[in-house]
Amino acid sequence: MAGDRLPRKVMDAKKLASLLRGGPGGPLVIDSRSFVEYNSCHVLSSVNICCSKLVKRRLQQGKVTIAELIQPATRSQVDATEPQDVVVYDQSTRDASVLAADSFLSILLSKLDGCFDSVAILTGGFATFSSCFPGLCEGKPATLPSMSLSQPCLPVPSVGLTRILPHLYLGSQKDVLNKDLMTQNGISYVLNASNSCPKPDFICESRFMRIPINDNYCEKLLPWLDKSIEFIDKAKLSSCQVIVHCLAGISRSATIAIAYIMKTMGMSSDDAYRFVKDRRPSISPNFNFLGQLLEYERSLKLLAALQTDGPHLGTPEPLMGPAAGIPLPRLPPSTSESAATGSEAATAAREGSPSAGGDAPIPSTAPATSALQQGLRGLHLSSDRLQDTNRLKRSFSLDIKSAYAPSRRPDFPGPPDPGEAPKLCKLDSPSGGTLGLPSPSPDSPDSVPECRPRPRRRRPPASSPARSPAHGLGLNFGDTARQTPRHGLSALSAPGLPGPGQPAGPGGWVPPLDSPGTPSPDGPWCFSPEGAQGPGAVFSAFGRVSAGAPGPGNSSSSGGGGGGGGGGGGGGGGGGSSSSNSSSSSSSSSSSSSSSSSSSDLRRRDVRTGWPEEPAADAQFKRRSCQMEFEEGMVEGRARGEELAALGKQTSFSGSVEVIEVS
């Protein structure tokens, strides 16, 4: 061992004091104590080599040198070529011969012997030297970085009252209970961040607030931060001073002060911590509270981003309604809403009695539709997004009451805008003595003897699929047909319609009309080539439709035909005794066509080639609501005849298309 091989040099306190007083060129004094002991007090101009287990092991393994352990301020002395005297001391060692071989001081001395010519140990250590020569001892602050070594609040505060802002003070329980100190600083509001600290007697209840939390790693201080900031602002608005305190003014109250600086001054959590730390160095929020400050910082950033983008994204655009002279576009209701709306419309039209010359009733769905429009306008959906949505599923809702009120009905509908939402379809169910021509109603303001043809819609190109958001659907019946109000989409009967082999009369009975069956290869949906020239495609659910000539199954027959349509995708059909069998439908149509007149044929041809006039207001509300939902994209790139055959096989209907009796 080095201690056994050569006796250690020793130096007493007096000799070291004389060398230190001699000025520059004195010995290199090394302090082998811990950093905490060295930081509190040490010999003048001494260098600390921390006696830790890590440093000891690295010295034994030769992974660190003495020059690397000595601070850079004294490294020039180590690298000097002239001989250097070294004095090593610990806390209280008097005899180096009694040191253990594996002690830190023994290992350090052996390493110093290999670097320096003269290495001595101070007799009695720092305890003896500091008692004899306190003037040659000094203490300096810790060279720690500006970070928090989290620890619980100390029972006794290290400093007194601290002023953070002109109206905000940070202190401890002792400071708050000192009435003279509080009066001297003009503090009249107290924010107590503890469970145990009492309320001062000289502070009224209205100026006192308690946050019942403890200083541990489980408490939630974040929910209390906004209330605390409001309380501090209340004192500021009253031109008073407020003190935030806990037991020692180190952790809980410091966290609240940091949060207040973050909120009011717009600082980050790090900057706010340094702001408070510079004014009260003793603060040390625990890691739990520091993490909650980071969460609070994120919430403040999110709030600031929302406030910045609020005028552009948060607030909806001003809506253009009837007051501005522009009607709001309507959206199709769901299947259940459409059926319910149609039932309510029929009931209201049957039971209500509007005054003659008065306006039509306001649709009941207007408030809900307006609220939905406001929500959708706030979303700022682009036209491309709307088109993508329309391609997935297209819903046609034939809600006449909500879509064609006289106050909202446009006189000249133009071509649909691809960026608009899907429009509601029109179901023409005319009443009166002629097909497609509504009879004037006494309670309708538009009751005039003559009729005006409605401008037809332009058919989209054949290459593009049927994507028009507005479609027309017509249900046309004979002269003696009546319309009886019914609810929903249930099976309907037509007591006024003549059956096969029965004369048409008001007292004749006809079996109930069945819904058209699902298209099949034996009885598919038939497409009329007239649709290419007319306003839209004409469909027949019961038989083939000829190109406009009267005959069996044609829409021009008196009681057995069915037809109508427009807008590129609507159609309807109805027969005297309806059946999914096309042969029975044809025979029924043939017997009915024999009693038709040529004038009736001409009128019905005119109806097929043009749009009928808008029906009266009372007839509108008696119509039925029918909704068809189908998937599109299956008919692209096929011939028109093949399109309808594929459509009959692949299209799924959410509700059955019923033949509706009219009055």
Curated annotation (Swiss-Prot):
Record-annotated active site: 246 (phosphocysteine intermediate)
SUPFAM superfamilies the UniProt entry points to: (Phosphotyrosine protein) phosphatases II, Rhodanese/Cell cycle control phosphatase
Biased composition regions of type Gly residues, renumbered to the chain: 558-577
Keyword Membrane applies: no
Classification via InterPro entries: Dual-sp_phosphatase_cat-dom, DUSP8_DSP, MKP, Prot-tyrosine_phosphatase-like, Rhodanese-like_dom, Rhodanese-like_dom_sf, Tyr_Pase_AS, Tyr_Pase_dom
Chief location category: cytoplasm
Tissue: Expressed predominantly in brain and lung.
Keyword Zinc-finger set for record: no
Residue ranges of domain Tyrosine-protein phosphatase in the record: 160-302
Gene Ontology MF term list: MAP kinase tyrosine/serine/threonine phosphatase activity; phosphatase activity; protein serine/threonine phosphatase activity; protein tyrosine phosphatase activity
Record keywords, A-Z: Cytoplasm, Hydrolase, Nucleus, Protein phosphatase
GO cellular component, one term: nucleus
Segments of skewed composition (Low complexity): 334-353, 427-448, 546-557, 578-600
Pfam family, any one: DSPc
Location(s), subcellular: Cytoplasm; Nucleus
Occurrences of domain Rhodanese (ranges): 23-138
Subunit organization: Monomer.
Similarity comment: Belongs to the protein-tyrosine phosphatase family. Non-receptor class dual specificity subfamily.
Name of the protein this chain belongs to: Dual specificity protein phosphatase 8
Source species: Mus musculus (Mouse)
Name of the encoding gene: Dusp8
